[in-house]
Amino acid sequence: MRIIPLGGLEQIGMNITAFEYEDSIVVVDCGLAFPEDDMLGIDLVIPDVTYLKDNASKVKGFVITHGHEDHIGALPYVLKEINLPIYTTKLTMGIIENKLKEHNLLRTTKRKVVRHGQSINLGKFRIEFIKATHSIQDASALAIYSPAGVVIHTGDFKVDYTPVFGDAIDLQRFAEIGKKGVLALMSDSTNAERRGFTQSEKTVGITSVSYTHLRAHET
């Protein structure tokens, strides 16, 4: 198996990674980045997908982990270069569809909604969607199965036992897959060097509402 990062490493944003095994390529996420201060006149930064265009016959589709711009924002631009089906969860698909409408791509783009716990087959790959928790709902981690072994792609995540909506992250499923053996783990590492634990989104929400109420009262 070849793992080909096309963006998102050692930077914030523009997350996109290709997984290749023989005649099959699947692409996880397709995000954009925002320009640095010295990038004058540039509004958005999108990934270089030359490799995907050069191997278009192998590419089976985009698999999207969640609906933040740094994971989906480049889709309308990339789809104009190489039209591929999109696989993701319901809420994430809804966000993507709004973008596709803006770019007149909705009718020409194949889409499939996938539930957590469900798997899809794309060429030589089988991809399982695993429930994750993040600051946006319906986030997924992925178990990417191939004849070479299984790769776990966490997507963006936090271990949140009290999310605002829905179930907590499915740590049991990670453990079950881990017992069988994993070829590689690709993990979100944002703030990994900071001490302590990430707050639950429920706590973040209460803190934000309390602060807003206090500011309004002071005014």
Model-found features: residue ranges?
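His/Asp/Glu-rich metal-coordinating catalytic cores
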Residues: M1-V63, H68-R215
